[in-house]
Amino acid sequence: MANFLLPRGTSSFRRFTRESLAAIEKRMAEKQARGSTTLQESREGLPEEEAPRPQLDLQASKKLPDLYGNPPQELIGEPLEDLDPFYSTQKTFIVLNKGKTIFRFSATNALYVLSPFHPIRRAAVKILVHSLFNMLIMCTILTNCVFMAQHDPPPWTKYVEYTFTAIYTFESLVKILARGFCLHAFTFLRDPWNWLDFSVIIMAYTTEFVDLGNVSALRTFRVLRALKTISVISGLKTIVGALIQSVKKLADVMVLTVFCLSVFALIGLQLFMGNLRHKCVRNFTALNGTNGSVEADGLVWESLDLYLSDPENYLLKNGTSDVLLCGNSSDAGTCPEGYRCLKAGENPDHGYTSFDSFAWAFLALFRLMTQDCWERLYQQTLRSAGKIYMIFFMLVIFLGSFYLVNLILAVVAMAYEEQNQATIAETEEKEKRFQEAMEMLKKEHEALTIRGVDTVSRSSLEMSPLAPVNSHERRSKRRKRMSSGTEECGEDRLPKSDSEDGPRAMNHLSLTRGLSRTSMKPRSSRGSIFTFRRRDLGSEADFADDENSTAGESESHHTSLLVPWPLRRTSAQGQPSPGTSAPGHALHGKKNSTVDCNGVVSLLGAGDPEATSPGSHLLRPVMLEHPPDTTTPSEEPGGPQMLTSQAPCVDGFEEPGARQRALSAVSVLTSALEELEESRHKCPPCWNRLAQRYLIWECCPLWMSIKQGVKLVVMDPFTDLTITMCIVLNTLFMALEHYNMTSEFEEMLQVGNLVFTGIFTAEMTFKIIALDPYYYFQQGWNIFDSIIVILSLMELGLSRMSNLSVLRSFRLLRVFKLAKSWPTLNTLIKIIGNSVGALGNLTLVLAIIVFIFAVVGMQLFGKNYSELRDSDSGLLPRWHMMDFFHAFLIIFRILCGEWIETMWDCMEVSGQSLCLLVFLLVMVIGNLVVLNLFLALLLSSFSADNLTAPDEDREMNNLQLALARIQRGLRFVKRTTWDFCCGLLRQRPQKPAALAAQGQLPSCIATPYSPPPPETEKVPPTRKETRFEEGEQPGQGTPGDPEPVCVPIAVAESDTDDQEEDEENSLGTEEESSKQQESQPVSGGPEAPPDSRTWSQVSATASSEAEASASQADWRQQWKAEPQAPGCGETPEDSCSEGSTADMTNTAELLEQIPDLGQDVKDPEDCFTEGCVRRCPCCAVDTTQAPGKVWWRLRKTCYHIVEHSWFETFIIFMILLSSGALAFEDIYLEERKTIKVLLEYADKMFTYVFVLEMLLKWVAYGFKKYFTNAWCWLDFLIVDVSLVSLVANTLGFAEMGPIKSLRTLRALRPLRALSRFEGMRVVVNALVGAIPSIMNVLLVCLIFWLIFSIMGVNLFAGKFGRCINQTEGDLPLNYTIVNNKSQCESLNLTGELYWTKVKVNFDNVGAGYLALLQVATFKGWMDIMYAAVDSRGYEEQPQWEYNLYMYIYFVIFIIFGSFFTLNLFIGVIIDNFNQQKKKLGGQDIFMTEEQKKYYNAMKKLGSKKPQKPIPRPLNKYQGFIFDIVTKQAFDVTIMFLICLNMVTMMVETDDQSPEKINILAKINLLFVAIFTGECIVKLAALRHYYFTNSWNIFDFVVVILSIVGTVLSDIIQKYFFSPTLFRVIRLARIGRILRLIRGAKGIRTLLFALMMSLPALFNIGLLLFLVMFIYSIFGMANFAYVKWEAGIDDMFNFQTFANSMLCLFQITTSAGWDGLLSPILNTGPPYCDPTLPNSNGSRGDCGSPAVGILFFTTYIIISFLIVVNMYIAIILENFSVATEESTEPLSEDDFDMFYEIWEKFDPEATQFIEYSVLSDFADALSEPLRIAKPNQISLINMDLPMVSGDRIHCMDILFAFTKRVLGESGEMDALKIQMEEKFMAANPSKISYEPITTTLRRKHEEVSAMVIQRAFRRHLLQRSLKHASFLFRQQAGSGLSEEDAPEREGLIAYVMSENFSRPLGPPSSSSISSTSFPPSYDSVTRATSDNLQVRGSDYSHSEDLADFPPSPDRDRESIV
């Protein structure tokens, strides 16, 4: 025991001596002896004690907890005894360094020689633990990295290299000497990071001393030294751990990906083999056939092969160096005149893009999956094979690319989430141990109190573990820290400590349980640390403050030591002024999640005392609320109360080490609290005093009054509004800069800049005066403002000297000041900030990876790139690896997802295998894993709640107050004017506001149901007045604000309520709502009850509330916290709302009523609104009179027509027809006269039909209903467009410009289909709900991008021009020939030179946005970057890589502008999805986790039913075959053969030898024969049942097709496609095998996720198709005649509908949109010809840039950013659901297995089995349902109901077994009823049965019968014995008479008298009457039947089985 109870302070450290070693060996021997006895005990089944575990806070490389105090100086670096009890029986010792880091060593001999006491080993240990040693190694690594990054190192670096090797060798030697080599724990090679060091050193020596030929390859391994940084920095180790974990998790996804890619690659191989070599070759004439020479254009080639392989004979694609591909099918690319399509030369892209063999096809598919440059492959393939193969690409892109790549994201995100959960679990574990420790110490304390020991005077560790070091020590430590400047003075900064388990863990424990911060007061009561007090919600005590503690620490402590720092009273020095809020408080109970540097999310500050975050219950068991009756007289009432127990128990300490472990747990938290307390004093006291003396200016009264005046102005909301407007204006001014500005304009901008700089400087100055510098600089925003102002002033000063555009760009940061008043931007910056914080370590890891790969690339490939130098100019290609910067750029480009083109270059210079390896490694590790981890982090720190209801701060409210004031002013003016006008006409009614002011209204809380005030009746526009105006705060009126403001109880969140409003108001519930309105009286008076308003009015009010700003979130929160507001309960209907969304009534009930009402009322509504009728009384029609009656009848008829389902079907048909007609209006329409005429007539017809439909609906529904429905509005507008164009055509204005552009709007017709298709409507609803959030993010994106755009304009405006010689193509001239624009124009004598600009440039902010969009989507970004990098100056000729480091601008933009902001779209959409789900799927929210489990199990259970198995044939041979076919092994064999067949197909290549073709054909025949055999055998065995299985039908079809294909292969191949495709389809059968393999669970989960996603994905696909359709119609109307260049050519263009669809499908993934936009940006010569005549009568092949840019950017935002991200959101969502399902205890497969086994026991599918076979059945099941034998007792205990014939129903068994797996739960019974109903519905055939008994009751009956029998036998025996004894005595002559006989009549007497010679009593037979026999069973039952019946029924209804516990011995008897 003594070993474990370590005293406090220095005495806890003992030197490690030989005695210590001997003690350890002794303990080891004892443990071994104990081990043999425990083994014996475990064999006997006795419980084992829990194995000890190492302590988390005493792990190696952690910091020693403060509990142990500071080790004395002489023990630093010396071997000490291990503090962790876990190692007490292991040979280890620890060493501490100055930083108190723990190093653990093995106490065995190192290298067999050096004992722990050997001087050499001691010296090595001292060196190893020294912090300088670590720093030396770190510096060496970094220096080494710098040297490695040199691309052409000078010769002397060789010696530096030797130095590095020497240092690394020294490091390893020290480690080996100190630790030992590898035999024991904690030795050198036991740490995996040391393997890295070891291999690096071995490599270094190998390359030096052994000549291995290619040394550079081996030398590249030196780069792994960079990884050593990871082993040195502990934080990096954890993140690498997470990465490795996620890679492990990726195994399943990888397998699935490889499988899918293989299947697609096989399909590609079969479809496109050899196609990509088809080229347009110049026509030739074959000369004499003998030698095969050919002639073309007067030149002769010796053979056809030579001719075909000569690149000169191929046609090049327009304006590029690519060869034009073609194909021989009808819809493939064609060749122009003079060329023919032949298979010649190599494949495109240096021969690397092809489907000629499986490997190349696989690479092509991988490229397609990662979507790198896939549009090129798509265009090449479609051109050579045909447009129909777009379907193949759609499949691969949607299934392969979107699904698989996002699965990787989902898996990585889940791995990250799991790691987070693990951290939280670890923290909870600590918390548990902490509580144990507290309990234990409390017990000890109680025991000592009882014994009368003076606990107060003791200061040992036992009494005061929470105050480890005495106050002097701590004070000096703090002073030391302050003097060294390590204490941070930042605002609101959480302390970081070296110990990861210390304060960082504190972040996870949500200790900050906010009690009302306003009422925090210090308590003076002191007591021991274990005194417990009654906690009242209004009080919080402080930490013990060392400085003020008079009696020293030993005397006592403050009671609330565990209350964390953010909730403590701020010390006097740091008391915030009334003007500023104290930092660090958790406001409004919002949980703020912070992310620490490891990316671990921690929850800080929960205002809710019942916070649900892990660790929130930390203090509950410790700070007990003591019952009042335990207060002893000695204690003052209300003071702290002692927790005493009647029987003090210290048994917690009996177990060795338990107390030590407990104390260690306490230490984890206390050391954290210690540091938190210290960090509260942010600055040293002297600094504080200095600051308060000189930075708070309160000198004289005059100054104070000036200050007050300034403060009044500066703090006024209007000032804030003015400043915000200035920021916006300033931003606008900066955005107005552009290329070619006039001097006046430039001057205006400069003056503007001066003015704004002045305004902001003044603002800062006045704020400093008003607030004093001390308080001014305590707010983050103020610091930010001041920095920007200072930079602006610096820029003004320096701009005179030089043109520093760098400083100008700092002005752009002013844009961020908007974040103060724009919550979304603020939140977004916080998210990025959080992520950057979290990503700190991850970024480092990524940087290391990038560095390593860049150096590897440079070392391996650098030298080879010199071969690629341009022969003329001697320039390298843009992308090379000759130096580190370029190598870095290539790696960065790969991380952006572009790897294939740089890899082709690499393969050209360095060979294929190495390049493939390196590039694919970077791609997989960097892009797919690390970047996805980034994204996972981003998504985890993202929550839509932030974006929709952001945190409020004072400034923002100020802005809204200002706006509210302006509104109030306007309202006042308006009201005054109105009153004045009305006053002249009539008396005005009293205003409600006035009433409220006089106190006449019951409450100031106006509910959304309160009737509109009378004013609104007069003036509809001012109806807004009834609701709370934007920006107003209840009770927060500005000074001098006379009237209180009425507010709704809860204001709905904008994004959700808009959604609801949309659904209620516009998406199809209109008919019902109208019917409901019909049945309710319409009343607008103030006395109308709330419910009297119609539904549309309700929704109108809801929509108006939805507009109310988010500023009310604060108040809502307050409302939530207050128990009841006065006056709230006075109106029964308007109860106080708890949440932020106020439900007016129960919406569910409302919705339920609607259909019923709809059935009663089939009448139309009123035509006009009440307002219309009031103004125009003629609108009101009297339906009782004659004309009105007819009108009413007509309306009813129309109503019935419109409501009829056939009408709707007809309209849908017409919509589809009219949309289809639009697709024919292409470029060839003029040539097809008949079609044109037909379309014109059709167009008129459609217009008439739609106009008629509209008129019918007007008459039927009335204007009011028609025009309150969004979908009807859409129809109305589209019909209007058709009508206008029809009228214009009739009047002959068809050719007018505006009419033409209006005609293009007909493309919107398909939108009408949206409201008609349910699936699409769901998706659109979700989208409409997401629009507010999406717009928010889009706006923030634009702000972010604005900064980069303005910076781009500053850097590149006017620099993207170049002088080009037309005759030499588009290459710019050398700058030595032409230097600038003016020279170019002066040299342009022939008209061949001209000055041109890159089309997408930075000449103004708008153009900059387009350029940035291209960079962000990585399309077209190369040209922009090249132009930027080559730019020299304003209007100067570019020079190759003149401005090389401009690449950095793009790198930074890609990281922040593309990576963060574009991925936020995914975040928003995912979150929105979750919100929609919460709103729609009610059950999930109201179910506990436990209930969900049951619910899911039941859902699966109910959908199944027992099926009849296929009967085994009676024929002997058939039966034998049947047995073989139904075995699992047979299936597996067939699968194996299928895979083998695939392998043989993979072997095929293009141009294979005849022998190979022959062999493969034979193998194929063999497989066809085998599969045909399988089919025949199965048919024979299964007979007609064969066709009951869908897989069998599938197989049958494939076999038939294979046979047909083999027989007719030549014909099919000639006219259709390769029949081998059928065999590829057979791969689908692999899906079957996954069910059989239990191990493939992960892959099953992934496929299950896909299956779950399919319905939703289909809907999204439909929506996407609709968008594509509309855009392709627009494209045909606007871009049909643009010039063919860049991405537009003869196949990919907007001339026909099909071609437009090809283009738009390509852009859906944003691929190649720059190429399509490029020709549209042409505006005139020399790029295009505006005079060129077109077929439709128009002229020119120029584009319209504005329309083009709008067209492409909107399409990309809609498809690429929104719709495709919805796809991703659904996959992520379903993946998490599927994973949850797979981790549930019971899966679908378990139920399948149950029924499969059931079939064997119930072959007739009766749904019953006999009770006798139940035991066998339970044993035959697989886990987890299986109950292994012996299982009788368990089965009996289940109390299964039985029917007559002792049969049990399958549902009952399955339910009982499920219950056993999931455990007992209260919800089971309700679910059981639900399940039975479901089962009955699914199986109507289920025999209705009445159970007559249950298994348990049957057992009870059997046991009862046996007990009764035994008792009766015993009773008979006793009586017989008595009688026998009587007879014996009588015979012995004891003089006993007959009367004394115990049995004178009855059975015993009779039998006895029979057996004995002498009869007893008279031999008369009458004595043996029937009654003398024991009563028969029947008679008893009859007599007591009632009684029994009651008990029986009671029993049968008994819920609790525990009422009838079967005793164990009874059971044993029964078994016997």
From Swiss-Prot:
IV repeat segments: 1510-1807
Reported effect, residue 1610 to A: Complete loss of channel inhibition by the spider Jingzhaotoxin-I
Result of altering residue 928 to P: In BRGDA1; uncertain significance
Stated consequence of mutating residue 1262 to S: In BRGDA1; uncertain significance
Phenotypic consequence of residue 1709 to M: In BRGDA1; uncertain significance
Positions of II repeats: 699-969
Residue ranges occupied by any IQ domain in the UniProt entry: 1901-1930
Effect annotated for changing residue 941 to N: In LQT3; also in SIDS
CDD domains xrefs: Na_channel_gate
Effect after changing residue 817 to E: In BRGDA1; no effect on localization to the plasma membrane; decreased voltage-gated sodium channel activity; shift in the voltage dependence of activation and changed recovery from inactivation
Mutation effect (residue 232 to I): In BRGDA1; uncertain significance
Name the record gives this protein: Sodium channel protein type 5 subunit alpha
Gene that produces this protein: SCN5A
